[in-house]
């Protein structure tokens, strides 16, 4: 957050670079969520298929995605190794994610290896790596369903956890 001011104060050499493309500081949970949603927003001029724009990332070798016959995927990105049998809308689905039949993913980011069990619902959330959202569990909520708007924020399920339905 204070890298540039701290470098300036320490007398470090700073160099400016003119940049005209898309850039977003993802230093908060909300801004990380927004940046991912920008990738699927048709009103944001980002062309992921522009071969002159290099994307540097770790890509594990996995089979292609599998979209089940009853699955619904709308305005989302689903990467390799995913098995989608539920409903995915306006979401970013990382490699190796499983969305079981009857599960709903809305306006969310699922990190690599996440599993969403049948009947579970994920809304306005970031689900960490290798996290399991249990059968009929729910995480997150649409902002319009929250009475106290000041308390609403993107929900987070940290990596390597298992969320169960409230009994």
Regions found by a protein language model. Name each.
Residues 1-164:
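Left-handed beta-helix
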């Amino acid at each position: 957050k204070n890298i540039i001011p701290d470098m300036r104060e320490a007398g470090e050499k700073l160099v400016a670079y003119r940049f005209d493309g898309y850039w977003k500081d993802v230093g908060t949970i909300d801004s990380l969520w927004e940046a991912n949603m920008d990738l699927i927003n048709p009103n944001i001029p980002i062309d992921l298929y522009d071969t002159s724009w290099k994307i540097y990332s770790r890509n594990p070798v996995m089979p292609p995605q599998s979209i089940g016959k009853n699955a619904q995927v709308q305005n989302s990105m689903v990467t390799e190794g995913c098995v989608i049998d539920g409903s995915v809308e306006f979401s970013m689905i990382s490699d190796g994610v499983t969305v079981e039949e009857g599960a709903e993913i809305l306006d969310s980011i699922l990190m690599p290896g996440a599993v969403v069990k049948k009947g579970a619902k994920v809304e306005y959330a970031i689900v960490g790596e290798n996290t399991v959202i249990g059968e009929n569990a729910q995480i997150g909520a649409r902002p319009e369903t929250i009475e106290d708007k000041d308390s609403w924020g993107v929900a987070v399920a940290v990596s390597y956890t298992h969320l169960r339905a409230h009994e």
